[in-house]
Amino acid sequence: MAGHSKWANIKHRKAAQDAQRGKIFTKLIRELVTAAKIGGGDVSANPRLRSAVDKALSNNMTRDTINRAIERGVGGGDDTNMETKIYEGYGPGGTAVMVECLSDNANRTISQVRPSFTKCGGNLGTEGSVGYLFSKKGLILIASGDEDALTEAAIEAGADDIQPQEDGSFEIYTAWEDLGSVRDGIEAAGFKIQEAEVTMIPSTTVELDAETAPKLLDLINRLEDCDDVQNVYHNGEISDEVAALL
């Protein structure tokens, strides 16, 4: 919501408060275990695992905890029967919302997700109801750097697009399959990666007013409080003027 960053509007994130740390760690460990189970324990050869490790480190998870989770995934422990499920629905103001879940019990998950939509004036849709509005992309965030040099490095590495932000940061978009190789190329050119992960980018956005924006944020918060929810994506656009009123 700050500036005109698409990322800030696409994916709302709550601060990792101490009270939330246990739940955040649980979700991160689930993703580490699942990524290692599906793609193996070699971070350099498993982009999903690399992204999960980076996210875990950014949330101050220790290397020992990360390594134990990876070992569980590779070893096929009891908690590796998780499956990824995407739920689609409509939020306040007609916004499109996609909810990425990781769960071993679909009935439990839907019983958490559906009421979140209902309580916030939205409704859970059927598969494909809003998915066509989003594209799966790789996103790399760079906090600062020389724009010309970064653009050259990103293009050379195979990036699709680079977008400078008002705060001096940069958003670099890639084909999701190329995220790892583009990241490596940019790092090799001397730039520090702030974050890199696969995300969902909307093709169109819905601008929200001061009445509707808080309702969407409430929906996102409710969904992110669900244990099985890993990520929430939406196409709501919140202007600086509206954000200042929240």
From Swiss-Prot:
Cross-referenced InterPro entries: Integrase-like_N (IPR017856), TACO1_YebC-like_2nd/3rd_dom (IPR048300), TACO1_YebC_N (IPR049083), Transcrip_reg_TACO1-like (IPR002876), Transcrip_reg_TACO1-like_dom3 (IPR026564), YebC-like (IPR029072)
Keyword list, A-Z: Cytoplasm, DNA-binding, Transcription, Transcription regulation
Gene Ontology BP terms: regulation of DNA-templated transcription
GO cellular component, one term: cytosol
GO MF entries: DNA binding
Signal peptide location: none
SUPFAM superfamilies: YebC-like
Cystine pairings recorded for this chain: none
Subcellular location: Cytoplasm
Gene3D superfamilies membership: 1.10.10.200, 3.30.70.980
Transmembrane regions listed in the UniProt entry: none
Family: Belongs to the TACO1 family.
Official protein name in the record: Probable transcriptional regulatory protein APL_1151
